[in-house]
Curated annotation (Swiss-Prot):
Organism: Staphylococcus aureus (strain bovine RF122 / ET3-1)
Oligomer status and interactors: The system is composed of three essential subunits: KdpA, KdpB and KdpC.
Name recorded for this polypeptide: Potassium-transporting ATPase ATP-binding subunit
Transmembrane segments: 34-54, 65-85, 216-236, 245-265, 569-591, 611-631, 644-664
Binding-site positions, Mg(2+): 513, 517
GO molecular function: ATP binding; ATP hydrolysis activity; magnesium ion binding; P-type potassium transmembrane transporter activity
Active-site positions on this chain: 304 (4-aspartylphosphate intermediate)
This protein's UniProt keywords: ATP-binding, Cell membrane, Ion transport, Magnesium, Membrane, Metal-binding, Nucleotide-binding, Phosphoprotein, Potassium, Potassium transport, Translocase, Transmembrane, Transmembrane helix, Transport
Family: Belongs to the cation transport ATPase (P-type) (TC 3.A.3) family. Type IA subfamily.
PROSITE patterns: ATPASE_E1_E2
Localisation per UniProt entry: Cell membrane
Classification lineage: Bacteria, Bacillati, Bacillota, Bacilli, Bacillales
Role noted for this protein: Part of the high-affinity ATP-driven potassium transport (or Kdp) system, which catalyzes the hydrolysis of ATP coupled with the electrogenic transport of potassium into the cytoplasm. This subunit is responsible for energy coupling to the transport system and for the release of the potassium ions to the cytoplasm.
Amino acid sequence: MHHVNKYFNQTMVIEALKMSFYKLNPKQLIKNPIMFVVEVGMILTLILICFPDIFGTSYLSRSYLITIFIILLITILFANFSEAFAEGRGKAQADSLRQAQSNLTARLIEENGAYRIVNATELKAGQNIRVENGETIPADGVVINGLATVDESAITGESAPVIKESGGDFDGVIGGTLVTSDWLEIRVESEAGTSFLDKMIALVEGAERNKTPNEIALFTLLTTLTIIFLVVIVTLYPIASYLHLILPIAMLIALTVCLIPTTIGGLLSAIGIAGMDRVTQFNVLAKSGRAVEVCGDVDVMILDKTGTITYGNRIASEFLPVNQQMWEKLIVAAYMSSIYDDTPEGKSIVRLAKQMYINELPKDIDGTYKPFTAETRMSGIITNEISVFKGAPNSMINLVKQQQGDIPLNIESICMDVSSKGGTPLIVIENNVMLGVIYLKDVIKDGLVERFAELRKMGIETVMCTGDNALTAATIAKEAGVDRFVAECKPEDKIKVIKDEQAKGHIVAMTGDGTNDAPALAQANIGLAMNSGTISAKEAANLIDLDSNPTKLIEVVKIGKQLLMTRGALTTFSLANDVAKYFAILPALMMSTIPEMTLLNIMHLSSPKSAIISALIFNALIIVALIPIAMKGVKVKGYSIDRIFINNMLIYGLGGLIVPFLGIKLIDMIVQFFV
């Protein structure tokens, strides 16, 4: 999806211009009350052009009325363009995704093993298909046989192919991706219209986006201000009549448009849509605008150690026996406990055992494999002769104690030594006898210390949850720079951590990818699920990361904060604009009748007519000038919340007061020659 990342694309601009005219339809524009008021004013001006004296005698020429009409039309078109352009970027992404699933066929595996070519839309969940090198995977599914590299760039934008194989963490495939080597047999998991790609298209094509609570609140405020200014203008007419000041209806219409918050009113929808779009640029799909907005309020982040803070695939680096006599037995037992373990850790133990053991290791072991679970925290194999297990120190010590076994005196010191280095110790037992420890090495991701420091400045606390013991957790937490950690944390413990933080009034975000993460993802205010994760995790979350990079949560939270700050900054600018325009225009209109108003005419505008035209032109131009900021967002990197607030008040608050005075004066210096 990265190929639609440019902010300005000729095709999108043309489409946005077309949509700008379509959105002139009052049925469309009434969704934005502020711009609807502008359109009503434009229609009234058009009536005045056709019937100049319909509301009473006016000294304004038809050409002047036409000028007002054109400027009002352009103002609405600029506002429509900002929204249409933001929507167009999402639709362009949807089109690129739709290309990935067009005209696909599938090689269906019949019950007798024969193949039959069918249309991808005919596939049913539970059917098996075969996809070979150079073919596109026709549906979402799970690899049941084979190993191949798959190009997922059509979905994720990542050019490097990924390896897919049965079992383990990399057996899920997405329809629309391309097999670039070998072959795969896949069990179909979704049917036409319900695939992950279909859901992605529906998400990024959300033109009918529901407004978020903050947007609704702000829109209510802006609508209220619009009504107040309308009341001010309506009362201004009889006051002007009492003072024998002639204020034509067209001028009152223009004054209304200048004073109501048209700037933020024209950009508000674009800011929200662009916020979702910026999340999509990071290959994260937001199920709603509310999800992105809530990210901006997050002040506690729950982070898994494995895959988020460390690279995830812990590698067996050393076997540490309780004594030298146990050396060979430890290697063989570690190998046997891992031979059917499809996890990256299990495979690394098998590789290390083969490298270090001189004699031949058994290839086929007839026994019952016991996989690792979050409850037991151990895995191994039971045969007729022996039982071999590896697992977390506490679990293994408790198991040996329950079976009246002996605990070697040095086993805890070996585990503590591994933990103090930031590694993960796994104790190996054979027939209830402890043989030693496997040292799994964890590597912390680059640049996290700086990123966590940046989050701290923004008022966000980071909490690392890990199944490791307290010593290992403390070492990694200190090295990575997280604020707090929760050691020996099970999936159900994550929910407790989240609820405890929420009870304190915090807004909590977390990442997850497994079925056991689904309850916590649903409980958290923001849940970011991995694309490589289970369906239940993706359904529970409100954000999905296509790159399956848990660290992405940090970027998403920043974008959420940027969205809120952009909306706040442009609202501040718009309201400051209104105040400035009020004091810029009103004295110019009233000073001929009320000489004291001359003192307030600090801009020395040439005439009431040029003042109105200049203000209208400025009002229209400022909308288009702010579109890039609405699309890209204000800068928030590296600053504390207080610093960002001060910067925004200086730039957008003070700037919103000064810019209209300068802009209107410059335009007036040109307009006075034509009015």
